[in-house]
């Protein structure tokens, strides 16, 4: 084993080329590796929703929830089944084992629901089974506030949607706040009777004509008949000429018995935006989703650049509000890692400058970036991504990986005095410390390796922690024993400068002081007892801190954010207009909140980050509140303050 590390020392040209190649490839992989907020973990969860109009919460649970829950609980690979029942709505959530195939699990869930249908009340709605994918959340939410008629606003949203979907890495774009184009046919009742026609004949004629645009309703005597189909006729102006065969056999054109109205569908959602405290105005809200494995920082940056370019054309005069940007959050995490890494390098250099000299401090500090570039290669090659879990692992590893480099550097520094030659000092240091360093690293590896065997969703979620740390530790050994000695030879000088002599003298004084302190500690039993008692007392005190709640225990503590969400859910069947009144009442509160910069309101949909996973319906609304950069309250405190302000004015959930 010693010969392997000494080989790197002897073959200097090879080692230099290897360091250059690893650095180049590592920097490339750092740019190329996908970046996202969290690991893409497929959690096999299905939700069964069923409605029963007019039923109370207890009746809903008894008549629907319990019967579906009993069938679902008997499925294979079920981990947990939870349910909730409220007025007219039943929700049953089935979480399968983490190892289960999600598609097969959802199919089994649908089969179980089908078996339960026969026991449900006849007036209950058909149960709806939804597959939950927590990774399928928007990476960018943008609202465009512009003063345009409803029709033009819809055309603008279609254009923006097409522009954004053309960007590499974008999987889909959902739009809120627009109204679809729709044609209504108002039938003249007298004409219908005169020609002996029925509504079904009109529908059949339209279907035969292959109309390819949405026809919302056929209205006869204030009764609406909703219809939809697709075909080859793509202009509403062609509809009046469609022929219908009357009872007498004579052809009748649609214009003779009905009026064709080319208009817009009834709105299913509203969207508004308020910027810098100004009154909210109509807007369209676009939620951008990324493809699996896409680089979230690049995708969101490309979308924002596309919108910036469009301000010169289709978005001229429009106000663009970015209410959520996951790419910016990930980029911030990367900046934090870089800052922490640089701070660690500087601290290591400072400590080593004060102890063994400035040359040695540079040598030891270089082991950090070299180990990191090797780690990036490993992450990229293994299919991992840069996310907050892998970033946490890298930050955690910084303080561990530098130890090996410090040991080798200090050993070479000490042995230069006895061996005279820096190369011989490096060889002697490798022979003496190679196995102890490898053994020490393996003990640390043994601490993290069991995390590979952690089962369930948590095990999948944190799988990159042991992989990243163990890979970095192995990289640190390669760097410390294979590269640091060669770098140390370059920086080590047999004849020291006057500054280095002063440094050496200072270092010796520190060592002498510590030896004297340690000698006094070891020579007096009373001093030892006092020291050990203080250490034991501090240990017990540290253990008591979480027990008494002085130190909180959280799996992933929440940090300060630049935005908060307000979710509104009224009773089942609440019209969109009534929910809009609740949303406007909340908006009035937001105008008065000193920490609010802007907000975006969407009525008719819940947030993509809510428990309902972006569901739609007249009873739902959500408001994304963008907080000011300079504020006295953090996001948690702002959220609590908003709850207090909103509670008196809402009877909604």
Question: Predicted segments — roles?
Answer:
Residues 1-35, 433, 500-554:
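Signature of alpha-helical transmembrane segments and their immediate interfacial
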Residues 13, 20-56, 114-123, 380, ...:
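Transmembrane helices with small-residue packing motifs
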Residues 16, 23, 28-32, 63-80, ...:
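Surface-exposed amphipathic alpha-helical segments in non-transmembrane regions
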Residues 26-32, 319, 346-414, 471:
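Hydrophobic transmembrane alpha-helices and their membrane-interface caps
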Residues 46, 109, 350, 361-383, ...:
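Small-residue-enriched core segments of transmembrane alpha-helices in multipass membrane transport
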Residues 174-178, 186, 256, 280-350, ...:
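Juxtamembrane "pre-transmembrane" interface segments
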Residues 323, 330, 334, 409, ...:
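Helix-loop junctions and hydrophobic alpha-helical segments within the transmembrane domains
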Residues 398-412, 433-453, 460-501, 623:
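Transmembrane alpha-helices and their membrane-interface boundaries in multi-pass membrane transporters
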């Amino acid at each position: 084993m010693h010969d392997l590390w000494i080989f790197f020392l002897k073959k200097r040209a090879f080692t230099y080329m290897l360091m250059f190649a690893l650095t180049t490839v590592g920097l490339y992989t750092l740019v190329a590796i996908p970046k996202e907020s969290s690991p893409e973990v497929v959690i096999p969860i299905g939700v069964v929703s069923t409605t029963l109009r007019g039923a109370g919460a207890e009746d809903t649970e008894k008549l629907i929830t319990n019967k579906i829950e009993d069938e679902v609980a008997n499925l294979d690979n079920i981990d947990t089944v939870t349910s909730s029942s409220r007025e007219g709505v039943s929700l049953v959530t089935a979480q399968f084992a983490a190892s289960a195939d999600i598609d097969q699990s959802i199919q089994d869930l649908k089969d179980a629901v089908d078996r339960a249908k026969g026991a449900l009340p006849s007036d209950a709605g058909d149960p709806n089974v939804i597959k939950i994918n927590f990774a399928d959340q928007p990476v960018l939410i943008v609202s465009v506030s512009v003063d345009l008629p409803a029709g033009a606003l819809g055309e603008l949203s279609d254009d923006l949607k097409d522009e954004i979907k053309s960007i590499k890495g974008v999987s889909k774009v959902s739009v809120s706040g627009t109204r679809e184009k729709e044609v209504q046919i108002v039938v003249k009742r007298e004409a219908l009777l005169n020609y002996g026609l029925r509504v079904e004949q009109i529908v059949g004629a339209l279907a035969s004509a292959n109309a390819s645009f949405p026809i919302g309703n056929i209205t006869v005597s204030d009764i609406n008949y909703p219809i939809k189909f697709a075909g080859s006729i793509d202009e509403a102006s062609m509809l009046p000429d469609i022929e219908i065969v009357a009872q007498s056999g004579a052809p009748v054109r649609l214009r003779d018995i009905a009026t064709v109205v080319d208009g817009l569908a009834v709105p299913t959602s509203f969207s508004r935006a308020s910027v810098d405290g100004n009154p909210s105005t109509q807007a369209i809200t676009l939620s951008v989703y990324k493809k699996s494995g896409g680089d979230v920082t690049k995708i969101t940056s490309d979308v924002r650049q596309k919108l910036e370019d469009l301000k010169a054309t289709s978005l001229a005069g429009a106000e663009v509000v970015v209410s959520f940007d996951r790419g910016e959050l990930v980029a911030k995490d990367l900046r934090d890692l870089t800052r922490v890494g640089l701070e660690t390098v500087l601290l290591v250099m400072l400590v080593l400058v004060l102890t063994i000299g400035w040359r040695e401090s540079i040598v030891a500090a270089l082991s950090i970036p070299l180990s990191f570039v090797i780690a990036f290669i490993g992450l990229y090659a293994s299919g991992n991504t840069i996310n907050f879990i892998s970033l946490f692992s890298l930050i955690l590893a910084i303080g561990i990986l530098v130890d090996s480099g410090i040991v080798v550097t200090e050993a070479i520094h000490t042995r230069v005095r006895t061996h005279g030659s820096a190369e011989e000092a490096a060889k002697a240091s490798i022979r003496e410390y190679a196995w102890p360093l490898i053994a020490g690293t393996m003990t640390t590896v043994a601490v993290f390796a069991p995390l590979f065997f952690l089962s369930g969703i948590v095990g999948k979620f944190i799988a990159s922690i042991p992989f990243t740390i163990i890979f970095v530790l192995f990289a640190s050994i390669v760097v410390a024993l294979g590269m640091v000695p060669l770098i140390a030879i370059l920086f080590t000088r047999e004849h020291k400068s006057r500054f280095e002599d002063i440094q050496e003298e200072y270092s010796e004084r520190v060592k002498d002081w510590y030896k004297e302190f340690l000698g006094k500690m070891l020579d007096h039993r009373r001093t030892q007892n006092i020291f050990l008692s203080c250490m034991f007392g501090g240990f017990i005190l540290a253990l008591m801190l979480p027990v008494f709640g002085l130190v909180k225990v959280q799996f992933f503590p929440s940090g300060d954010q630049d935005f908060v969400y307000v979710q509104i859910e009224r009773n089942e069947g609440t019209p969109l207009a009534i929910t809009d009144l609740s949303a406007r009442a909340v908006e009035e509160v937001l105008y008065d909140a000193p920490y609010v910069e802007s907000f975006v309101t969407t009525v008719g949909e819940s947030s993509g980050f809510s428990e309902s996973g972006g569901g739609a319906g007249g009873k739902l609304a959500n408001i994304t509140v963008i907080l000011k950069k300079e504020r006295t309250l953090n996001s948690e405190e702002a959220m609590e303050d908003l709850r207090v302000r909103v509670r008196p004015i809402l009877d909604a959930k």
